[in-house]
Amino acid sequence: MTTRNTIILAAGKGTRMKSKLYKVLHKVCGKAMVDHVLTQVEKTDMSKIVTVVGYGADEVKSTLGDRTQYALQAEQLGTGHAVLQTEPMLKDEAGTTLIVSGDTPLFRAETFEDLFAYHEAKHAAATILTSMAPDPTGYGRIVRNNIGIVEKIVEQKDANSEEQEIHEINTGVYVFDNQKLFKALHETSNDNAQGEYYLTDVIEILKQQGDIVAAYQMANFDESMGVNDRVALSAATKIMRDRINEAHMRDGVTLIDPATTYIDAGVKIGADTIIEPGVLLKGNTVIGEDCYIGAHSELRNAVLADHVTVTSSLLEDSDMASGSNIGPNSHLRPESHIGPKVHLGNFVEVKKATIGEGTKVGHLTYVGNAKLGRNINVGCGVVFVNYDGKNKHETVVGDDAFIGSNSNLVAPLDVADHSFIAAGSTITDAVNRYDMAIARQRQTNKPNYYQKLPYRGED
């Protein structure tokens, strides 16, 4: 096997996207298109990877980091000109170079491997990746002679009626002999209507020199889909979503309705977990084995251990330990850490809090900036009052405490273990171990006062 390099073309602005975000940074299943391409390239054995950036260069670099080298195309003068910007990094390299666009998120590493293998087997100077398009309109056609050798690539606008009937199209992905690529690039011209240097001109130059130009036809046309507008972005997202969902199902995850299940590319799910319809799993969410994610739940960068149940709830940047459950209609906000066998019932909001093993927060409760120990009971309507108008303060509740319904815990506050807060109390001072705190007015009953009220109802 020869030395292999890759050039990813990611310099275009993408005006048809009609967006402030640069085209290759639009996301497909939670991941930038150019990141999808780089991820698949990384799975192959590459010596060097160079990404050509232009519009939004800093944003692209921030997204991809140091996983690739970068070349800047300051002026957008065509694909050939873009590749030429990598010359300082690649011109002295032997072997072969893959060229792929950053707006083609559906390519698989296996396709690149097959393309390299075909190129090397044919001893070609260039190999074009082609596919059979159901509707080839708009694509460059691959014209072969009667024994299957590539004669030329003809663009839609230049194709005659016979050539327009050809369904084999140019996907825009190539493998070149690296030395011959850069030599031929210096022979290209911008003497055309667009005033640009085209990479396809290199193919013609190599043929004129008598070099072998091959074409490898890939099996799956969908992989070659380029994204130029929001319609294509939606189509690519659907294909990727179906691919991701199928992979999880084959790994032992049950998706009740894959058509309404949305799983980002970075999500990991353990076997025997069940996902109900309408679920969104985003970012770097990790779900263990034997979990149950109920309908219309959304998890964003959440980490769930085994045997966790989520019922119609939103979890953000938080984690839940084994045997815990939440919902329905509850919300874990960032930096929440839920211990084993914790029960968070309906309409519970937790923010930047740690809740210990076996604690129960039944319903209609806000827990913010707090540390709760083990086996605590938090009654209905409890509020952890954490904000003084300027700063957030912390409440600490010890093991085996009991917080009665409709209580307010005003931070900063310490409630010791084995203590008891009476229902309806507003607690502002520390509560010691074994104490019961009551902070409410005594009830006053006024005899016969009902008859003095403007509205008395039926006698």
Swiss-Prot record:
The keyword Protein transport does not apply. Its EC number is 2.7.7.23, 2.3.1.157. It catalyses: alpha-D-glucosamine 1-phosphate + acetyl-CoA = N-acetyl-alpha-D-glucosamine 1-phosphate + CoA + H(+); N-acetyl-alpha-D-glucosamine 1-phosphate + UTP + H(+) = UDP-N-acetyl-alpha-D-glucosamine + diphosphate. Residues 1-230 are annotated as: Pyrophosphorylase. Its cofactor is Mg(2+). It comes from the Bacteria. Mg(2+) binds at residues 103, 228. The active site is at residue 363. Signal peptide: none annotated. Binds 1 Mg(2+) ion per subunit. Keywords: Acyltransferase, Cell shape, Cell wall biogenesis/degradation, Cytoplasm, Magnesium, Metal-binding, Multifunctional enzyme, Nucleotidyltransferase, Peptidoglycan synthesis, Repeat, Transferase. UDP-N-acetyl-alpha-D-glucosamine binds at residues 9-12, 23, 73, 78-79, 101-103, 140, 155, 170, 228, 333, 351, 366, 377. Residues 231-251 are annotated as: Linker. NCBIfam families: glmU, PRK14354.1. Homotrimer. In the N-terminal section; belongs to the N-acetylglucosamine-1-phosphate uridyltransferase family. In the C-terminal section; belongs to the transferase hexapeptide repeat family. This is Bifunctional protein GlmU. It comes from Levilactobacillus brevis (strain ATCC 367 / BCRC 12310 / CIP 105137 / JCM 1170 / LMG 11437 / NCIMB 947 / NCTC 947) (Lactobacillus brevis).
